[in-house]
Amino acid sequence: MPLPDFHVSEPFTLGIELEMQVVNPPGYDLSQDSSMLIDAVKNKITAGEVKHDITESMLELATDVCRDINQAAGQFSAMQKVVLQAVTDHHLEICGGGTHPFQKWQRQEVCDNERYQRTLENFGYLIQQATVFGQHVHVGCASGDDAIYLLHGLSRFVPHFIALSAASPYMQGTDTRFASSRPNIFSAFPDNGPMPWVSNWQQFEALFRCLSYTTMIDSIKDLHWDIRPSPHFGTVEVRVMDTPLTLSHAVNMAGLIQATAHWLLTERPFKHQEKDYLLYKFNRFQACRYGLEGVITDPHTGDRRPLTEDTLRLLEKIAPSAHKIGASSAIEALHRQVVSGLNEAQLMRDFVADGGSLIGLVKKHCEIWAGD
């Protein structure tokens, strides 16, 4: 399928996707019932969409195009009420978190969807292992060239986004020692990590043509980069965050990305170059492994900075943009989080350290989601 022309969007408009866990009490393992839930809610959703993701244990909640985080929060709140009623009616529960702490990938059923079945044929067991749960945020752009500039700008802050959203310390019944283990699942995919370097939309079109020669790429949706342009929506999509445990934190993360995008495209503070990515995977690893306690390294100067310190600096820089787009509440909430030194991964570990089981942890996450 050829790459579509870049659809012109209103700059800084917002779209948010949350991949949720469908679980089966009282054991709280992943259920394989998302299709049943989608059938139950599809005629009751008035704004946004509830749909499939890769496997039957995943349920995606997606907003429509929103002007600001308040509109997105309203859509999510309405969807949440409908979904919570459906899971109650079907004796299921739902929660956030980037990974389920003890599910077995071998049990996961890929959705009966042509695209996902084709992906299963291409990637085999890797697709079942990709039963992990992320938050994706789309930001509108006026042109393809703006999208490429924004993508490179946002890529500088991938460690910050990962650390602030880290919520996947447990996997396959084990403490991984990572704050966010979810991104590691994609390390075997040939398109893992950052997008290959291009400097404008014309070069991106050439890159996509080259990738399509592999016969593994039919559309932009087949690319699993950390951040990717979405020409059919006219957006840049940030894909590195774990699904938060609460809607409020998900909305705050979206506000952070929207405000950062506004600052980047309004101020144009960087002259991007390929060398910017020299230490990308090392800095990304620091955020995944240590969360806010990680240390990032400047590829140009060699300077090393605590991620906590650099995140506070980012929040300060984007505060005026956040005020202009109605996202100040998100930046203030994230500032409090950074100062406290806590993320959701640490809260999960604290629960287990206090004697809680992994089954109890999932149960707690369901209660948190339902009570937010």
UniProtKB/Swiss-Prot annotation:
Question: What's the name of the protein?
Answer: Putative glutamate--cysteine ligase 2
Query: Can you tell me where the transmembrane regions are?
Result: none
Q: Determine if Translocase is one of this entry's keywords.
A: no
Xref: HAMAP family: Glu_cys_ligase_2
The record ties this protein, via NCBIfam families, to: gshA_cyan_rel, PRK13516.1
Origin species, per record, is Escherichia coli O9:H4 (strain HS)
Q: Name one GO biological process term.
A: modified amino acid biosynthetic process
Name the InterPro entries on file. Answer: GCL_type2/YbdK_subfam, GCS2, Gln_synth/guanido_kin_cat_dom, YbdK
Question: Would the keyword Nucleotide-binding be found if you checked this record's keyword annotation?
Answer: yes
Taking the record's annotation, the residue ranges forming a coiled coil are none
